[in-house]
Amino acid sequence: MINTSQDLKDLLFRINRKRYPAYKDTKGSYRFPGYVLSIDHVQGDPFAAPSKISLHIKGAQAGFPESLYATREMRIALQNQLIRGFAAHIEKYNFRAKGSGKSGLIAISKPGQEILERSACTMDAKNGDLTIRLEVGFPANGRTINSGELIKILFDFLPVCVKDALFYRNLDARKLEQVRALAEDQTFIRKELAARNLTAFVANGSVLPRESGVSSRPMKNGIPFVSPDSMAVTLDLPNHGPLTGMGIPCGITLIVGGGYHGKSTLLEALELGVYNHIAGDGREYVITRDDAVKIRAEDGRSIKHTDISFFINDLPNHKDTHSFYSEDASGSTSQAANVIEALETGSHLLLIDEDTSATNFMIRDELMQRVVNRNQEPITPFIERVQWLSDAQGISSILVAGSSGSYFHVADTILQMDHYKPVDITAFAKKEAEAFPSIQPSAPSGAVADYRRVIQPDPAFRPDRRLKMKVLGMDSISVNHDAIDLRCLEQLADPEQIQALSALLCYVERRLFNGKDTLHQIMDQLDKELSTRGLEILSEGGRLAPNLAMPRIQEVYACINRFRGLKI
């Protein structure tokens, strides 16, 4: 049942100056001019987490042309733009209503540089119906209702913001068309990668360095990227037209150079190139195949029966590496597990930086092989497997190295970053490498790994159990005080992705883990559900949290694999 806005105002007058819990009587939906306002959740007191409300606008009234949301990528870009615009409008009214605690707060997601699907704004792909989800601190004096201040928010502030930020007729049509065009061009580039046998594309003129270690905005006066002529590719984009940049081919690409010359900066841009970026970011035309996974050592991580025998065998403690278990993995075993788990997600591109890798996992030079006999070393280093992965499995690698030249022998393409500019030194490096002994690649006797891990549902997640889950920024998720450490998942771009990972862990534990299907099968099913319904699968009682951003399936896998309570 939908009530009128006057019904809401009358109710607010009736409960004015009552104890704060009386605000719960306002839950429901109310028709305002041009939209429906739903009060979905009411906070318990003015100092608790804010109340959740949603705004619903019919597509015919919102008036956005179908061309602006004709594809999923365009729709997500439009939603992202609407959130930004609405956030700018409500910021003017934030805490204008007064009271105790969180009284007067009006807040919505604040998107960063990446364009992510978010629960804060969803648009129906069929009819353009629009839903905005936000948080409001219901005002109080102490713990007594101050409904006059809430009336200001709901009847004075929000209607102005809705009118100015959510109806097409009041927005800059040219700006929205630019958002659509960029999304279409980015999608075109992503599809061209496969067609041209490329792993990534970096447009000339891109600005890769960021403003600071705590800011993802582009560095002012950053040196624009220029492709080496030998790797230049020109794409004819649907809207931008011809665009030239560096195409990184499939295979093994090595990025070398002196310290501070831009090696890691390029790799960092590539690892976040799995997402589209907003115009003006400097990386809007840095596009990496979207299944790429950044690999690193992760000392101390939990590993639950992952088959790492592709890299590690015959451990002196007789641990079974075909089903390796550890609550405190070493650098090499953690990096081996990270590679295998990335391949389990279906990734065909591994991104590796020497600085964050376990040396004994990456290389083993000739002198060490002479001193420590091969049959005394349980680790088969990555350098001995990387060519087989590329040639036999179609799995490419992009590696950054600054201290060891061992990978010159196996690399297909070698780039040197020189004062932030890439130089193709493949021929020169290969010739120089001839004077040094090469490491012989080795092919495995069978498949890369056995991915038949069957997950048992954890009783702690049963609806009748008291479950304490808490998201701790970008670092971790606490499950009954047991932390899932996410600090090494460098491709997570937004805190709201962590919120979504927390909700998705609950979802798979309660609905998908059945003690019969493998993790791979369950993740395939989850991926299909997310592709079809998006974050709506996480709605409870018809209500979707306003602070979720879509993670990739690769990060969902990674989160589950790091859950120490995982039962296999």
Stretch-by-stretch model annotation:
Residues 1-188, 193-197, 208, 568:
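N-terminal accessory targeting/assembly segments
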